[in-house]
Amino acid sequence: MAAFLRCPLLARHPPLARAFATGARCPFMGFAHRAAPELQEDVERPQIPAVEVLEELLRDGGAALNRTVRDCMDEDAFPYEEQFQAQLGALRRTHTYRVVTAVGRRADAPPLGTRGTAPHTSVELWCSSDYLGLSRHPAVLRAARAALDAHGLGAGGTRNIGGTSPLHGALERALALLHRQPRAALFSSCFAANDTALDTLARILPGCQVYSDAGNHASMIQGIRRRGVPKFIFRHNDPHHLEQLLGRSPPGVPKIVAFESLHSMDGSIAPLEELCDVAHAYGALTFVDEVHAVGLYGARGAGIAERDGVQHKVDVVSGTLGKALGAVGGYIAGSEALVDAVRSLGPGFIFTTALPPQRGGGALAALQVVGSAEGAALRRAHQRHAKHLRVLLRDRGLPALPSHIVPVRWDAEANTRLSRALLEEHGLYVQAINHPTVPRGQELLLRIAPTPHHSPPMLENLADKLSECWGAVGLPREDPPGPSCSSCHRPLHLSLLSPLERDQFGVRGAAAG
């Protein structure tokens, strides 16, 4: 009855009987009259503990879990399930089917984690992209908790509709300053940042051509493909091939040259200045993905461009909050007009919920750590441990590539077998990297990511156990180990260990250096 009395139409009809009669003919009030008590705002909701609700959902959902997409269709409909199973079968036959390993990272004891019911309930994590361990840094956690208490769990909307907090603006300004660019824009992930920025730029630049490195990440490839513009693939990190391709384009045509400063899988570092100089000589914008370099290179942790002193030659830089900075999210930085255009016209920025404020608070604190003396010390320790591990692996005749990401390359089947053996037999979690993350034929046995929190004994143990599993699987070794990588022929820089580092790492590291 209270609902009827609040209706502006029925308020003009005081007699209750007449009000009910009118309400029966009103579509809105008729619905209110028939509504169940649970839908009425003045009915108290039962207080059921969230755990009991979840248990009830899981208990009652068993039947629904067994349904297929064909259950509500005629027999002559397309065989959807069979097609799905055929695709999955092909992955299993080529040893590229993805099995997710559930590991709970321990914030109190990096780089350890837990596996629950597995034989080794405690595991060492060797494939995390939390390169510096900042996701559990006390200052980062305090800032994230403070933002959570102040603003709640979610952003509450898109950036344009109620989802922009003061923390979003502060983080964008800090990221722009980090890369010495006028402006930055945050995205839900760096996949979204690359995809949206490249797609939007290709759309708004008339007749745009895109020149893409052959090793680019899937997010860049998707953004380039989405618009269907003319695209040209240059050999990985090859400025001479890039120049050959650019030389065929008319000078007045807008062009974008897109590449990664540090390759996400093999860890190779691009000749950044040379690529930028070639691009600018032919009037092309440079779009540089610094995802795996931010926080790890440069005096302030801005990446390879800062390390090489060429930040001014990068027109658009993309980065992530989710690796060395220990948070979640992505961003681009560039000129005021360029970033504003992507922000104003990019669907991946406009039509998605903004990053939660606590992510911004935590990321701001992580940036402060990265730019401090502590951050510089973490970067030194990170690089030192990567060098040490390469020494140990090469000593054992294992084909390690030269990078802070230490990939050990072999075929897909061996990838899976060795990764499983390391985890199940020794409690060492190193993920095999297979197609489509890398092209067929370029599968990486292990993508090892040592951190400052892996101790020298941990590095020794990993090398010993990997060597043991390598022999058990029957894989050949490189004997004697050469001074350069057998895959890319780049020097391994084993001699870069300082006397202090050699003393710390013992006889093996010193002898190999």
Swiss-Prot record:
One of its GO terms (cellular component) is mitochondrial matrix. It catalyses: succinyl-CoA + glycine + H(+) = 5-aminolevulinate + CO2 + CoA. Its EC number is 2.3.1.37. Erythroid-specific. Pfam families: Aminotran_1_2. Pyridoxal 5'-phosphate binds at residues 190-191, 264, 292, 320, 352-353. InterPro entries: 4pyrrol_synth_NH2levulA_synth, Aminotrans_II_pyridoxalP_BS, Aminotransferase_I/II_large, AON_synthase_class-II, PyrdxlP-dep_Trfase, PyrdxlP-dep_Trfase_major, PyrdxlP-dep_Trfase_small. Gene3D superfamilies: Aspartate Aminotransferase, domain 1, Type I PLP-dependent aspartate aminotransferase-like (Major domain). Pathway: Porphyrin-containing compound metabolism; protoporphyrin-IX biosynthesis; 5-aminolevulinate from glycine: step 1/1. The active site is at 323. GO terms for molecular function: 5-aminolevulinate synthase activity; pyridoxal phosphate binding. Its main location: mitochondrion. The modification N6-(pyridoxal phosphate)lysine is found at residue 323. It is a peripheral membrane protein. It comes from the Eukaryota. Succinyl-CoA binds at residues 98, 212, 231, 437. Homodimer. Belongs to the class-II pyridoxal-phosphate-dependent aminotransferase family. Catalyzes the pyridoxal 5'-phosphate (PLP)-dependent condensation of succinyl-CoA and glycine to form aminolevulinic acid (ALA), with CoA and CO2 as by-products. Contributes significantly to heme formation during erythropoiesis. This is 5-aminolevulinate synthase, erythroid-specific, mitochondrial.
